[in-house]
Curated annotation (Swiss-Prot):
Residues found modified as Asymmetric dimethylarginine: R131
Comp. bias (Basic and acidic residues): 483-493, 682-696, 703-714
Domain FHA: 64-125
Listed Pfam families: FHA, PH
Entry's free-text remark on domains: The PH domain mediates the binding to phosphoinositides.
Modified residues annotated as Phosphoserine in this record: 51, 192, 220, 223, 325, 335, 382, 405, 431, 445, 463, 472, 491, 503, 520, 522, 535, 541, 553, 557, 565, 580, 585, 683, 976, 1022
SMART domains: PH (SM00233)
Protein name (Swiss-Prot/TrEMBL): Pleckstrin homology-like domain family B member 1
UniProt feature, compositional bias: Polar residues: 157-175, 368-377, 547-559
Lineage, opening ranks: Eukaryota, Metazoa, Chordata, Craniata, Vertebrata
List of residues that carry Phosphothreonine: T524
Gene for this chain: Phldb1
Length: 1371
């Protein structure tokens, strides 16, 4: 290979390998060899004349760097940089980035990124040539070429005369041949849009067959292809076309602000919406070599200029929504223009193009009209001029056609858009490039129908795209045919042309001549048009290079004709188009202002329409009067004018009929179409000549009859007959035209069906190609899917194996965890049992100690009873001594009185000592009262402080009972040992409820015997009598002593009283300390001192005078004693209450008795209060017990719910294990049973097993025996063993035989975890896998085979009752 082309090392080998890997086809074609591949590539032609090899350089997806030292494609040649440029392949679209180095595409230097198109020539550096091939684009372009059309390569002629002035298809101004073009600055957006459109238009270069042979390439400096065209475009060569003038001038630069969107209404659009190409658009095919291209106006600058349908199917539907215009398609079908139109329509509607391929407007003006038959300027009374619209259609040029903008309809424009997309396309195509033909149509709205040449001033300048389009007309045919101009309206009412190919100037003169003869309102029309006839063939102004001047249109009002006739034929000055919708930005206020102006304009035009309709009616009335009043040779022509004005009025009243279709005037090309139209016109002319002859003869005969008539009475009848005949002739003419129109409609329907078939065929081919492509993609995806599924299956198998291994490991870990938990649970259970045992021992010890205390309390009670008896005996002795003392005192008094009387008032010498002894006996009594008061107050506060919860408030009746205390004090003086021995035990506290304390309280409460109580009451009942006498004596002797001793005695008493107070306080403090010291030991019954006076017990709080439990509590105050005291007082059954003593009682004694009765009543009331308080306390205790019971029930419920929740958690965990692991073991039906009275045989029989019918199992209430085959632990051998399940020993043992002499192994119940059927068949070489079950322990897994299925089920249910290895399954 040539070293200048490509290096053989490094990337070169890689590139060759890439090309060889792709589908590279070597095809022998005779003596040649064709190399073909499917990928985009560059064909290197070498760097100079010395290069001999041809290299294919593939362009892979992504970036490919080219240069003398590039890593991808290395080329050697003059002017090549190390990294000269790079080509980026992005999904089939290849773009060249020059990197600032010398690069040309098709001879044009490029300085910025440029898209590469099929067949373009690249020159890198000075002489390194590369051809770019894109097989996909080429294949797609070939598929788009219709059948029978070939696309020869255009001539590469850089030396053409005009090539210097053409860049990217735009003409630059030539000083010698062209007027200077306006230079407008382009915005960046417009430049980018123009550049994109240039690429799009570069992509579609095709030729029509035979064009190259008919016309040499040298005469076509322009590209023979433009814009997707397949339509031949060349400069005009006919004189008629060249007479237009400034056909090759651009009035403004491309995409200048003057080219408004609406000014290019007939410009072929990309798509109805003018949007960017969709993703389905294949790579566009560019032009190559020196093909110069036309840049059409982009769709972005035409917001609503196109009304074509979105899809061919929609377009075909829309084509039948309105009545077809037969004349239109009759003109277009049998000619090369028809082929052009069909292809243009397919180009527009094909979905494969994605709405991106512009339609080329074909100018048929190049065909000379040398064979056109001109009619005389004036034919008076000719019926052929009585057609409904006798106005010229063939004009010198077309008004600038604009699409119907939804926001503004410029005045004076003439529509080419139709409601049918097919007609729309035809009208648009034939209206863009017309240079010598005139396009007219019925008005789309009333304001268009009355605009004539006077509204041309309001038109903006022509779109530069139209101007550029005029630069590329069709090549002139060598044998031109007569060109016929005709238009048939879309409405079923035909409008026939009267001008058969005549020039617009001649026909304007003809109309003017007729107007003069018929007294037209514009009599000088011919004279005004004649002087300007020569100017029509000269150069027009640039703004009207495509035919801005026009005569009166068929919808033109007489006012416009008057303007024409008055000589106002000034050429309007080109103006900038203001208030265009495209010049309005996104500002909402400007849009609102724009719509307001448009609305006012529409209102003005509607008013003008109404005025013009009135004017037309006035003209009709004048014509009718004139025809009746006038006579002569011109009467035959009046109905023609009348009908014309009527048709004008009708068209003015029906503006909507013109909205549907555009009526195109154009010449036909092609021999067949020319002959057909010629025959049609010849037949119509023959009928017109016959009508003319008939009319002339009738006119002559009428004139002769008029001359020969004897009078004027027949003249009115003759006029009526002539008028009726003219009407009949008009109707006949219309019927003929209607018949011809129906024939043309038939032909048009056939042609349209053929066109539809061709469109569908092309669409079908495109869809088939897409289908094949997608099918291949589907096959590739299917292969990838199969490979992916295979890989996924392998990965899934690997993951499943890994998961199974992990599952086994997890299961082992779970077993170990469960074993640990079971051991911990067992240890916890053992510790709990030990604690319960120690608690029971402590409770037993407490109960024993309470019993001991009860015994001690009973002994203390007995001791107290003995002490009470002793005190009573001493009290009796004391009473007897006191009685003797009293008697002795009485005797002493008698002696003293006698001695006083005998001695004359001198006392005994020992009187003071006696008084001192009496004071010693009396003063401690006073101190004792204070001591009792202090003691009771101390006891009350101490008890209240010791038990504030359980003690009721102190009784109010006992607060000021001083007399009772005084009596008890005196009682204690009278019977000194008694107060110290009578005592009651301290009741147990309210918080204690033990039986021992209740027993001690009950025992101590009953301890005083009735006899001792009676003795005590006898001693007490005898107190008042002795007390009265004693007090009287004491009082008298005390007063005597006070008189004698005075202050000395008082001081002594105070001293002794203070000492007694100190002693009482010390004793009360000791008792208080003893009381508080015994307070915490509430179980102890002896909190008070052992010797306590019974009157103190009267003042104890009720809560301390009874036990805790109501059924065992006894009042320590003996109420029976008070009752007996009352009884003894009433009956007087005591020796101390003898009538002798009662006789000595004074009135003071009676008051004291009443006081004691009051005290008894108070005691009864206190007893009732004590009973009530006892009931209240019992109620409180009952409530406390009830609350305690409720609390225990709540705790039990919580415990049950907690245990149920724990059970649910365990079951859930088991279920999760079942779901997660494929080797999860089935749960056994029964949990272990540890009850000692559990009957194994009954349990098995209740489970549904037939124990008696199974001979392989010996079952009793505690033991199960039978033969099983067991697999060995170390050596996996199966041996028959005799198994014994013993619930007494809590073991599962197995022996060599049933004699149970040689023990082989023992399984303890606590080691058995689970018993389950071997559903996984994991036992190796099992004798019978269907009868194999497993016993899992902490250490190993036992496999056993039962002799029968029933035996296996029995053994499994038996062993599971001893499976105590899993403690969480137990309650």
């Amino acid at each position: 290979m040539d070293p200048l082309n490509r290096s053989q090392l490094g990337p070169g080998c890689k590139t060759q390998a890439v090309v060889q890997k792709g589908p590279l086809d070597l095809i022998e074609t005779g003596q040649g060899l064709k190399v073909q591949t499917d990928k985009p590539h560059l064909v290197s032609l070498g760097s100079g004349r010395l290069s001999t090899a041809i290299t294919l350089l593939p362009l892979e997806e992504g970036r490919t760097v080219i240069g003398s030292a590039a890593r991808d494609i290395s080329l050697q040649g003059p002017g090549l940089a190390p990294e000269h440029c790079y080509i980026e392949n992005l999904r089939g679209t290849l773009t060249l980035y020059p990197c600032g180095n010398a690069c040309t595409i098709d001879g044009l230097p490029v300085r910025q990124p440029t898209r590469l198109t099929q067949g373009c020539m690249l020159c890198l550096g000075q002489s390194t040539f590369l051809r770019f091939n894109h097989p996909a684009e080429a294949k797609w372009m070939k598929s788009m070429i219709p059948a029978g059309v070939r696309a020869p390569g255009p001539t590469y002629n850089p030396g053409s005369a005009e090539s210097e002035s053409l860049v990217n298809g735009n003409h630059t101004a030539q000083p010698a041949t062209r007027a200077p073009s306006a230079c407008a600055s382009h915005s960046s957006l417009v430049s980018s849009i123009e550049k994109d459109l240039q690429e799009i238009m570069d992509s579609l270069v095709l030729e029509e067959p035979g064009a190259a042979g008919k016309k040499p390439a040298a005469t076509s400096p322009l590209s023979p292809m433009a814009n997707g065209g397949r339509y031949l475009l060349s400069p005009p060569t006919s004189p008629g076309a060249m007479s237009v003038g400034s056909s090759y001038e651009n009035t403004s630069p491309a995409f200048s602000p003057l080219s408004s969107p609406a000014s290019s209404g007939s410009c072929a659009s990309h798509s109805p919406s003018g949007q960017e190409p969709g993703p389905s658009v294949p790579p566009l095919v560019p032009a190559r070599s020196s093909s110069y291209h036309l840049a059409l106006q982009p769709p972005q600058s035409r917001p609503s200029g196109s009304r074509s349908s979105d899809s061919p199917r929609l377009g075909r539907k829309g084509g039948h929504e309105r009545p077809p215009s037969p004349g239109l398609r009759g003109l277009l079908t049998d000619s090369p223009a028809a082929t052009v139109l069909a292809e243009a329509r397919r180009t527009t509607e094909s979905p494969r193009l994605g709405g991106q391929l512009p339609v080329v407007a074909i100018s048929l003006s190049e065909y000379p009209s040398s064979g056109a038959r001109s009619q005389p300027a004036s034919i008076p009374g000719s019926p052929k001029f009585q057609s409904p619209v006798p106005a010229p259609r063939n004009k010198i040029g077309t008004l600038q056609d604009r699409p119907p903008s939804p926001f503004r309809e410029p005045p004076g424009t003439e529509r080419v858009l139709t409601s049918s997309p097919s007609r729309q396309l035809v009208g648009r195509t034939f209206s863009d490039g017309l240079a010598a033909t005139r396009t007219l149509q019925p008005p789309e709205s009333p304001r268009l129908g009355r605009r004539g040449l006077d509204s041309m001033r309001e038109l903006p300048p022509l779109s530069p795209s139209l101007s550029r389009r005029a630069l590329s007309p069709l090549p002139a045919r060598t044998a031109p045919d007569p060109k016929l101009s005709r238009e048939v309206a879309e409405s079923p009412r035909p409008r026939r042309w009267a001008a058969h190919g005549t020039s617009p100037e001649d026909f304007s003169l003809t109309l003017g001549a007729r107007g003069r003869r018929t007294r037209s309102p514009s009599p000088t029309l011919g004279e005004s048009l004649a002087p300007r006839k020569g100017s029509f063939s000269g150069r027009l102004s640039p703004a009207y290079s495509l035919g801005s001047l026009t005569g009166a249109s068929p919808r033109q009002s007489p006012r416009a004709q008057r303007k024409l006739s008055s000589g106002d034929l000034r050429v309007p000055i080109p103006r900038e188009r203001k208030n265009s919708i495209t010049e309005i930005s996104d500002n909402e206020d400007e849009l609102l202002e724009y719509h307001r102006r448009q609305r006012q304009e529409r209102l003005r035009e509607q008013e003008m329409e109404r005025l013009e309709r009135q004017r037309l009616e006035t003209i009709l009335n004048l014509c009718a009067e004139y025809s009746r009043a006038d006579g002569g040779p011109e009467t035959g022509e009046l109905p023609s004018i009348g009908e014309a004005t009527a048709a004008l009025a009708l068209a003015g009243r029906r503006p909507s009929r013109g909205l549907a279709g555009a009526i195109v005037v154009s010449g036909r090309c092609g021999e067949e179409s020319g002959g057909a139209s010629q025959r049609l016109w010849e037949s119509m002319e023959r009928s017109d000549e016959e009508n003319l002859k008939e009319e002339c003869s009738s006119t002559e005969s009428t004139q002769q009859e008029h001359e020969d008539a004897p009078g004027a009475k027949h003249q009115g009848e003759v006029l009526a007959v002539e008028e009726e005949r003219a009407q009949v002739l008009g109707r006949v003419e219309q019927l003929k035209i209607r018949v011809k129109e129906l024939e043309q409609q038939l032909q048009e329907a056939a042609r349209e069906a053929e066109m539809e078939r061709a469109l569908l065929q092309g669409e079908r081919e495109a869809e088939r190609a897409s289908l094949q492509k997608e099918q291949r993609a589907v096959d590739q995806l299917q292969e990838k899917l199969v490979a992916l599924e295979t890989g996924i299956q392998k990965d899934r198998d690997k993951e499943a194996d890994a998961l199974e291994t992990e599952t086994k490991l997890f299961e082992d870990l779970e077993f170990q965890q469960l074993e640990r938990e079971s051991r911990v649970e067992e240890e916890r259970e053992l510790a709990g049992q030990g604690l319960l045992r120690s608690k029971a021992e402590l409770l037993r010890s407490v109960s024993k100690r309470k019993e001991r205390l009860a015994v001690l309390d009973s002994q203390a009670g007995q001791i107290r009873a003995q002490a009470v008896q002793e005190s009573e005996r001493l009290a009796r002795e004391k009473n007897a001594a006191l009685q003797l003392l009293q008697k002795e005192k009485e005797k002493l008094n008698v002696l003293e009185r006698r001695y006083h009387s005998l001695t004359g008032g001198r006392p005994f010498p020992k009187t003071t000592s006696t008084l001192k002894e009496m004071e010693k006996l009396l003063l401690p009594a006073v101190d004792l009262e204070q001591w009792y008061q202090e003691l009771m107050s101390g006891l009350g506060t101490g008890l209240a402080a010791a038990s504030p919860r359980s003690s009721p408030p102190p009784l109010p009746a006992k607060a000021s009972r001083q007399l009772q205390v005084y009596r008890s004090k005196m009682d204690s003086d009278a019977a000194s040992p008694l107060p110290r021995t009578r005592s009651g035990p301290l009741p147990s506290s309210s918080g204690s409820s033990s039986s021992s304390s209740q027993l001690s309280v009950a025992t101590l409460g009953r301890s005083p015997s009735p006899k001792s109580a009676l003795l005590a009451q006898n001693g007490t009942s005898s107190l008042p009598r002795n007390l009265a006498a004693t007090l009287q004596d004491i009082e008298t002797k005390r007063q005597l002593a006070l008189q004698q001793k005075g202050h000395q005695v008082i001081e002594e008493q105070r001293r002794r009283l203070a000492e007694l107070k100190q002693k009482a306080a010390a004793e009360a403090q000791c008792q208080w300390d003893a009381l508080h010291g015994a307070g915490p030991f509430s179980a102890g019954p002896s909190g008070f001192p052992a010797l306590m006076h019974h009157s103190i017990l009267h003042h104890l709080p009720a809560g301390r005078e009874r036990g805790e439990e109501g059924e065992h509590a006894y009042d320590t105050l003996s109420l029976e004693s008070s009752d007996s005291m009352e009884t003894s007082i009433s009956t007087g059954g005591n020796s101390a209450c003898s009538p002798d003593n009662m006789s000595s009682a004074s009135g003071l004694d009676m008051g004291k008795i009443e006081e004691m009765e009051k005290m008894l009543k108070e005691a009864h009331a206190e007893k009732s209060r004590l009973m009530e308080s006892r009931e209240r306390e019992m109620e409180l205790r009952r409530q406390a017990l009830e609350e305690e019971r409720r609390r225990r029930e709540q705790v039990e419920r919580r415990l049950q719910s907690e245990s149920a929740r724990r059970q649910q958690l365990v079951e859930k965990e088991v279920k999760l294990r079942e779901k997660q692991f494929s080797q999860a073991r089935p749960l056994t039906r029964y949990l272990p049973n540890r009850k000692e009275d559990f009957d194994l045989k009954t349990h098995i029989e209740s489970s549904g097993h037939g124990v008696d019918t199974c001979l392989h199992v010996v079952l009793s209430s505690k033991v199960c025996r039978g033969y099983l085959i067991k697999m060995g632990g170390k050596i996996k051998s199966w041996k028959k063993r005799w198994f014994v399940f013993d619930r007494l020993k809590r073991t599962l043992s197995y022996y060599v035989d049933k004699h149970e002499t040689k023990l082989k192994g023992v399984i303890y119940f606590q080691a058995i975890e689970e018993v389950y059927y071997d559903h996984l068949r994991s036992a190796a070489k099992s004798p019978n896998p269907a009868l194999t079950f497993c016993v899992k322990t902490h250490d190993r897994l036992y496999y056993m085979v039962a002799p029968s299925a029933e035996a296996m089920r029995i053994w499994m249910d038996v062993i599971v009752t001893g499976a105590e290895g899993y403690t969480q399954f137990m309650n």
